């Protein structure tokens, strides 16, 4: 679906936006910054359409927004370190978590960044291996390997490490 017209954008926002925001929240752990990052990615997409045109805009926007959210987190981290050095208290820190089961969220958070991102794209956004590979600029084999490792790590963590082979 091309997000090139107002109608396309309205349709995207109505159908994909909530899932993309949820995916970015899961990938980055940034509950409050995810909607802003998704909106920035959409604006960037409209201002400078990527070439070649992505096969799946939801996946493309999720990756772009995840990157924007991570950049914002880095900036906040640098700001927090500077504030600590100045002994200025940070206000408004919200430690709210997703409505996911605590164990599942903890297991997902424990995954390496790329595995977590690939899992969310694949399982939450129902993206194919090829679409994820294209969006992340990696091979399909890399995506498959990361999915396999992520599934193993999640299963081990969620079952208390009581898995065979």
Regions found by a protein language model. Give the residues of each.
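A short, charge-rich alpha-helical start-of-domain segment used by transcription regulators
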Residues: 1-22, 32-35, 116
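Sigma70-family region 2
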Residues: 2, 40-57, 75-76
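Short, small-hydrophobic-rich alpha-helical interface motif
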Residues: 20, 24, 34-45, 64, ...
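DNA-recognition helix of helix-turn-helix
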Residues: 66, 136-160
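A short pre-motif secondary-structure segment
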Residues: 118-122
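Amphipathic, Lys/Arg- and hydrophobic-enriched alpha-helical face
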Residues: 12-31, 48, 62, 108, ...
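Arg/Lys-rich amphipathic alpha helix in sigma70-family domain 2
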Residues: 63-85, 97
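Short amphipathic alpha-helical boundary/capping segments
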Residues: 103-112
